[in-house]
């Protein structure tokens, strides 16, 4: 097996992403476990400028919300966009260099954050590279637009609509996020806009782009309704960017934007219902009986649905005062991120024989990997939601009783309630790291020692185009 430094086409470039994906997931697992350990055992483990809970939190945020997200957007664009446009990518050498520039700058941010922790923002970006990231991603979006305008098909397929939306909102979020502001409300407002556009929309659209591809080409099914697909796309496009403001309910944000966020979050039920009906009716027509790929797709969709149900339920006026400014919002972020990562695992399994021409045998190793991933993601999602509910209720009860839970006896009581699920999260991070290690071994085994099979060709016919 050889991977050329300068690939000649999209198919050759995709090999780079397939090989690198398990390594990035492993990096995420290592940093996540280290962060959880330094938080739980802060009084035992040594703390210094390079190993402390605060810096590890920022490193974890950057890997999760920036490095992996940008990597997935580039990965999907390289492979899916030419298939949905019916032609090869225009000016591919420039596209290749721009893609490497995006991933390279996000990786450089990680290194600069470790070397200059004072310039490392909470979500992981640094002030050194922000303007360069905006420029290089602007060039990437421009190249995507040029290719879309040169498409050979009369309309843009649903998976490409979501993919282009993810790229556009990623660029918008880069222009939004800056350092700390003097006015406290400005920090809340900017952080909320960043979380909504970058994490909620970015990861949701990556997931939905992959979902529409995998439920058609991945499991050989026929999309039930393009109309429902369009309803889902435009619904999530207009509603998701507003949904994070509600988690600052009762803070210094204006009431009107909190109320808009509450109403629009409830409205997520419409695109969610359209997408759910489309998914259920589509998968009933599948002809591929690969249980591992199908189970990962179905489970990731279930996580996505639960995450959006959390968004809707938290918008009820008698519930949001309890859940604002708690871990419940982190649970929602986690759901969007790991629904995309889970379906990415199934996508990589699907691509290995297509790109490398190596058959992947779905043995006990792949079954165990799938089980651990699904177990960790589901339990961690519920654990973070539970922490949010318990801490929010305790804060409100303590404030009403005149015994605040941010210090003293009230804080000790709150910590006794949430310490167990927080410790559970640390052990779940250990299992997640183990699952990612198994996934790395699975991919490596298939790429190196898998039986030779027929790889797909770069030519695209009308019959091969996905929905």
Placement of each model-derived feature along the sequence:
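Non-cytosolic membrane-interface motifs at loop->transmembrane helix junctions
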Residues: 119-129, 155-158, 186-196, 253-264, ...
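Internal maturation/activation junctions in enzymes
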Residues: 284, 317-318, 325
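Short, Lys/Arg-rich, polar N-terminal cytosolic tail immediately upstream
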Residues: 1-9
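Surface-exposed loop and adjacent secondary-structure segments within mature catalytic domains
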Residues: 183
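Long amphipathic alpha-helical scaffold segments
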Residues: 285-290
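Hydrophobic cores of alpha-helical transmembrane segments in multi-pass integral membrane proteins
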Residues: 14-46, 50, 54-114, 127-147, ...
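Short, intrinsically disordered terminal tails adjacent to the first/last structured region
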Residues: 1-2, 462-467
């Amino acid at each position: 097996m050889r991977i050329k430094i300068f690939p000649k086409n999209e198919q050759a470039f995709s090999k780079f992403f397939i090989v690198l994906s398990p390594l990035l997931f492993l990096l995420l697992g290592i940093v996540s476990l280290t962060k959880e350990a330094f938080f739980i055992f802060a009084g035992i483990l040594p703390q210094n400028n390079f190993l402390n809970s605060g810096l590890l939190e920022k490193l974890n945020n950057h890997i999760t919300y920036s490095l992996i997200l940008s990597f997935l957007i580039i990965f999907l664009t390289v492979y899916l966009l030419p298939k949905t446009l019916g032609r090869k990518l225009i000016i591919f050498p420039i596209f290749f260099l721009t893609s490497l520039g995006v991933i390279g700058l996000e990786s450089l941010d990680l290194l600069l954050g470790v070397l200059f922790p004072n310039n490392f923002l909470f979500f992981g970006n640094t002030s050194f590279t922000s303007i360069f990231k905006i420029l290089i991603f602007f060039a990437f979006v421009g190249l995507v637009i040029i290719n879309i305008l040169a498409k050979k098909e009369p309309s843009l397929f649903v998976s490409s609509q979501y993919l282009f939306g993810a790229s556009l909102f990623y660029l918008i979020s880069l222009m939004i996020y800056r350092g700390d502001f003097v006015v406290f409300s400005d920090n809340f407002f900017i952080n909320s806009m960043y979380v909504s556009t970058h994490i909620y929309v970015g990861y949701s659209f990556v997931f939905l782009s992959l979902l529409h591809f995998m439920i058609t080409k991945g499991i050989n099914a026929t999309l039930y309704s393009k109309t429902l697909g369009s309803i889902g796309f435009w619904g999530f496009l207009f509603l998701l960017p507003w949904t994070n403001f509600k988690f600052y309910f009762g803070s210094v944000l204006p009431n009107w934007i909190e109320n808009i966020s509450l109403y629009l979050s409830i409205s997520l039920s419409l695109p969610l219902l359209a997408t759910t009906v489309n998914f259920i009716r589509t998968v009933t027509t599948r002809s591929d009986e690969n249980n591992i790929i199908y189970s990962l797709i179905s489970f990731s969709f279930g996580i996505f649905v639960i995450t959006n149900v959390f968004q809707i339920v938290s918008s009820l006026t008698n519930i949001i005062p309890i859940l604002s400014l708690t871990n419940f919002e982190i649970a929602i972020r986690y759901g969007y991120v790991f629904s995309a990562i889970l379906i990415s695992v199934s996508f990589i399994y699907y691509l290995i024989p297509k790109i490398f021409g190596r058959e992947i045998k779905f043995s006990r190793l792949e079954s165990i990997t799938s089980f651990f991933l699904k177990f960790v993601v589901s339990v961690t999602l519920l654990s973070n939601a539970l922490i949010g509910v318990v801490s929010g209720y305790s804060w409100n009860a303590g404030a009403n009783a005149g015994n605040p839970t941010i210090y003293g006896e009230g804080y000790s009581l709150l910590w006794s309630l949430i310490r167990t699920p927080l410790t559970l999260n640390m052990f779940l991070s250990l299992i997640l790291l183990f699952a990612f290690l198994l996934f790395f071994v699975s991919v490596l085994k298939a790429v190196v020692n898998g039986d030779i099979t027929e790889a797909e060709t770069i030519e695209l016919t009308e019959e091969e185009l996905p929905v």
